[in-house]
Amino acid sequence: MGMWEEASDTGMKGKKKDKNEEEEERGKKERMVNLTLEMIYLLTGEHYIPRKKSDDGGALHAPGSVIQKENNKNDKKILELMSNIIQLLTGEVAIRTHHVSIYFSLDEWDYIKGNKELYEEGIKEEPQQLRPQACEYKDESNVTAHMEATLCCNSDGNFINPENPEISPGEQPPPANGIKEEATSSEEGNQSDCSINPLTEEIQGTDTPTPIMGCSLNYSLSDNYISDEIKEEETSCQGRNQSDCSITPLTEQIQGTDTPTPIMGCSLKDNKYDGNPHWSPKNTLRRKYSCNECHEYLIHKRDFGKHQMTHKREKSFSCSECGKCFLNQLCPDRHQTGKKPFSCSKCGKCFAFLSDLTVHRRIHTGERPFSCSECGKGFTRPNALIIHHRTHTGEKPFSCSECGKCFSKQSSLVHHQRTHIGEKPFCCSECDKCFASSSELNIHQRTHTGEKPFSCSECGKCFTNHSHFAHHQMIHTGEKPFCCSKCGKCFASSSDLTFHRRTHTREKTFSCSECGKCFSNHSHLARHQMIHTGEKPFCCSECGKCFSSSSGLTAHQQRTHMKVKPFSCSACGKCFSNRSHLIRHQMIHTGEKPFSCFECRKCFSNPSNLARHQMTHTGEKPFSCSECGKCFASSSDLTFHHRTHTGEKPFSCSECGKCYSKKSSLVHHQRTHTGEKPFSCSKCDKCFASSSELNIHQRTHTGEKAFSCSECGKCFTNRSQLSRHQMIHTGEKPISCPECEECFVSSSQLTAHQQQAHRMVKPFSCLECGKCFSNRSNFARHQMIHTGEKPFSCSECRKGFSNQSSLARHQMTHTGEKPFSCSECGKRFSNQSHLARHQMIHTGEKPFSCSECAKGFSNQSGLARHQMTHTGEKPFACSECGKCFASSSKLTAHQRTH
């Protein structure tokens, strides 16, 4: 369109020259020009005609005549003309309130007329801002003079709908889609004194707002104001009459520059403006204004004032269902109804607001217009860039009033504050489980649907959420970007690093409200609390067995039903159902024990063993048995103990059918069938079926006796020996015979009693002499008589013994130690059995009687020797002369004759 120029009343000749052009430009364009000329005449009293530029690029100007207009009549006429222009361009109806011009489609206007009460309060919300992204122009002389228009009020201060003057615009309801606004302000003078703003409108079928007159502008809605989808532009008029206002190009100072730039009349090419006060393309941002509420920095005073209003605005519109508050009436309506009128043409996904759809489309196009000046990373939203920028600056402007913890995002603070108040507003419709955030609810709902939308391109494994997927991919890449400043150890995720750092500080910020136990991370606390509640939400679809964690369910399914063990050890070929078990196993080969006790510096291969060990220092036993009140350091120990009351033995051997209460006991038993002894001593190369046996054996080389009795100070190489010893002081005999109810200190004593007194089976028989034994240890000890093996030797005299207890008794002859004393006569003995035998002299007790002659004996060996007089058995033969004897002592005495 040619430039607008003033002309006098005598300039009618120009109109005649343009008749040919007007005939060619019929239709909507001609109508818009005529309506605009008429509107300018009503506003200024001057005639304007369109003319082409002169050859030298100058604009022809002719002074026009000025007339006195009647304001009230003209205002109404201007409203009608403006409405006609808008309808010609967009098919929308415009109304004017006290502060904003708002544009509605014809369908929306029908809705407004039927629901005016709902709109009366909603229209009072503060409008949001639509900003131009950038502006470039070569020559200001090439820029057309800009048409500016503002809908004005009548003399009574009321604004009239041109389609229906009887309806006040202030009574209109909100439209079904986004609202476009154009805000004005007047400081001195009346409404008619306001300057004239460029009219912008979003052309239907496009995504970007376009000015009605002037040039084509590229606008982007600032994501800081997307919630209401309101677009605005501010102007002010400093107390002038409307007739004095000149029609000048509306300028906007683009952030990051120092010169005002015309908004209209040029073609915008640079789309790098992102509305982010922290960033400018040339990194020349001047931070003039700082918000005391959220520490946000802004360049312009006008933007600073607007930003502060976001803190002052009340969210007066609340949802009747959940109580959530919103800034305007439109948001709770969409929130309650779930209406999403804006759909993506690519994937069909729907959105409640047009701005959300605009941002979503960038996923398909790959457009990331907002880039970080530090690292170059791109983002689809400017607020995402602002949040990202804080990772470089370390800024965390949002702090919790309860604990003082700081966050870089407002949403993170809100989510954190729910941990203090316990609020979980998002509930699952399937199982009624509630969550603190909608994202957690969405991830949880996938456990019901089984949806795993994130799949790994390397191994095909699928995940329910993107964070797990990203964490998994680092396994393939080996990337560990998060390093500990204390020890230099690196991790794949920041959460793993945070958890690791607590091993240095020993910080345990999460405590159980039931028992007071503290944990270093929230997931461990949640898992622990299920012990108190008994909750096991993860059930196996095959057998119905329930678990407290999804990892437990997965391990169960792989181990029991699928029997899949995809993780194999490269050293020994052993397979495992999950990676953590493989990593723990590999530490056996490497000898790595990264977890050390702060008290005694003892090291462990996994944190659970360390935690269990630390309870030996603190004496803490938080898990108590409901049957007998006995306390335990771990829940697994309590579970094993419960089985002594119930008699449950869920683990059975496939070879012989023998059952066990613990899986480890079954594994140890199965090695008796396979003969496997994977644990070998580095000193003597002796092999053992379990690591505990190896540890006990290694103490014979080191002489270490780590377990000491608090009563008498006696030391033992393993805990079981100490426990058995302590029963001497306490008199406790927890194992009872079901036949005669006699009590014993250990299960081995009970077994021996049952075999002797109740004629139980003795499955282990000696191939040399045919003697039978009830347990393997006694059988192994007996075989040493035939082989002559004596693996335990005295360090003083080098005398050998077939078992460690005999060696211990012998060593007391060198030390002279006799810790057991008789309460009757004070005589002391080197071992408990000798004391017990001696005490029978005082009591006269002879519990062992001969079945042949009923003679009584105080000990079993005396009875055995006596029975040989009835049978005539003489098992001990002299190797020199072949003479036989009933006892080894007599054989020894005889051998001295040779």
Curated annotation (Swiss-Prot):
PROSITE patterns: ZINC_FINGER_C2H2_1 (PS00028), ZINC_FINGER_C2H2_2 (PS50157). GO terms for cellular component: nucleus. Residues 186-209 have a biased composition (Polar residues). InterPro entries: C2H2-ZF_domain-containing, Znf_C2H2_sf, Znf_C2H2_type. The keyword Signal does not apply. A zinc finger (C2H2-type) spans 289-311, 342-364, 370-392, 398-420, 426-448, 454-476, 482-504, 510-532, 538-561, 567-589, 595-617, 623-645, 651-673, 679-701, 707-729, 735-758, 764-786, 792-814, 820-842, 848-870, 876-898. It is found in: Nucleus. Its main location: nucleus. May be involved in transcriptional regulation. Belongs to the krueppel C2H2-type zinc-finger protein family. This is Oocyte zinc finger protein XlCOF7.1. It comes from Xenopus laevis.
